């Protein structure tokens, strides 16, 4: 049975005080409202990780939004996997489309980040996805497959099974274009098919694949009903406790 995962990505939002308030609200609501088989994750700014980890309960796990690919050293401004682990982090987003676009992160860099995260007991939330131009050119499936191959396929089957994948249809995020349930399911099925080509159908069927294309309370139920969509990587809606919890109740 694949894990159901609803992960919130706060991005660069919320001061420490605001973050503590939101995290407390989510944790308290989750305790009473979210089904036991749904894994809730909040991926929050570095400055709030240690403090928030102390105010949540066992219904919510803490995630980071990035990690550096080395254990330690002279890398000013970076945060390592051992540091994240030391403050209670369980998950880490790797390869978000914004990191790829604004910071030029490459598939090889992301492969290194995945490796070091797993070595330190963190669960990678690995992001992949295509732009509108790539989709319209008909190369979107090959493009996403290449992201997966170059960043994940060096892993052993045992390590690979610890990864959670998030599909981000970049063309449907903040563009006014909406991905239908059918389009989302098609890409998730193609991703699982590609995973099976490397690791076999049994392993591929264990991997949770989240949808990261503007999931909200009003579209979550349809998306989460799709055969190959196991959860969501939530952006804006994760900044409102009620919306985030309502999405988690949509299975």
From Swiss-Prot:
Pathway the protein acts in: Carbohydrate biosynthesis; gluconeogenesis; Carbohydrate degradation; glycolysis; D-glyceraldehyde 3-phosphate from glycerone phosphate: step 1/1
Active site per UniProt: 96 (electrophile), 168 (proton acceptor)
Keyword Cytoplasm in record: yes
GO cellular component labels: cytosol
Main location: cytoplasm
Xref: Pfam families: TIM (PF00121)
Lineage: superkingdom: Bacteria
Gene Ontology molecular function: any one: triose-phosphate isomerase activity
InterPro entries: Aldolase_TIM, TIM_sf, TrioseP_Isoase_bac/euk, Triosephosphate_isomerase, Triosephosphate_isomerase_AS
Catalytic activity: D-glyceraldehyde 3-phosphate = dihydroxyacetone phosphate
A single GO BP: glycolytic process
Subcellular location per the Swiss-Prot or TrEMBL entry: Cytoplasm
E.C. number(s) listed in UniProt: 5.3.1.1
Binding site for substrate: 9-11, 174, 214, 235-236
Family matches, as SUPFAM superfamilies: Triosephosphate isomerase (TIM)
Alphabetic keyword roster: Cytoplasm, Gluconeogenesis, Glycolysis, Isomerase
PANTHER family from the UniProt entry: TRIOSEPHOSPHATE ISOMERASE
Summary of subunit composition and partner proteins: Homodimer.
Protein family according to the UniProt entry: Belongs to the triosephosphate isomerase family.
Function text: Involved in the gluconeogenesis. Catalyzes stereospecifically the conversion of dihydroxyacetone phosphate (DHAP) to D-glyceraldehyde-3-phosphate (G3P).
NCBIfam families associated with the record: tim (TIGR00419)
Protein name: Triosephosphate isomerase
Species this protein is from: Cytophaga hutchinsonii (strain ATCC 33406 / DSM 1761 / CIP 103989 / NBRC 15051 / NCIMB 9469 / D465)
Gene: tpiA
């Amino acid at each position: 049975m694949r894990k159901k995962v609803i992960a919130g990505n706060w991005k660069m939002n919320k001061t420490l005080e605001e973050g503590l308030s939101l995290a407390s609200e989510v944790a308290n609501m989750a305790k009473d409202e979210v089904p036991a088989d749904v894994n809730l994750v909040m991926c929050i700014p570095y400055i709030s990780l240690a403090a928030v980890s102390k105010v949540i309960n066992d219904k919510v796990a803490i995630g980071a939004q990035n990690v550096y690919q080395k254990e330690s050293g002279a890398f000013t401004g970076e945060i390592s996997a051992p540091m994240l682990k030391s403050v209670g982090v369980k998950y880490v987003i790797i390869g978000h489309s914004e990191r790829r676009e604004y910071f030029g992160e490459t598939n090889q860099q992301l492969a290194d980040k995945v490796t070091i995260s797993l070595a330190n007991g963190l669960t990678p939330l690995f992001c992949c996805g295509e732009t509108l131009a790539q989709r319209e050119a008909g190369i979107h499936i090959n493009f996403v497959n290449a992201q997966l191959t170059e960043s994940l396929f060096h892993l052993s089957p045992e390590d690979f099974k610890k990864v959670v994948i998030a599909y981000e249809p970049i063309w449907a995020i903040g563009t006014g274009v909406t991905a239908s349930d059918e389009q989302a399911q098609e890409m998730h099925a193609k991703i699982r098919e590609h995973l099976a080509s490397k690791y076999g159908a049994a392993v591929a069927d264990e991997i949770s694949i989240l949808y990261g294309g503007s999931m909200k309370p009003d579209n979550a139920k349809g998306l989460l009903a799709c055969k190959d969509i196991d959860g969501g990587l939530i952006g804006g809606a994760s900044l409102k406790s009620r919306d985030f919890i309502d999405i988690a109740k949509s299975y």
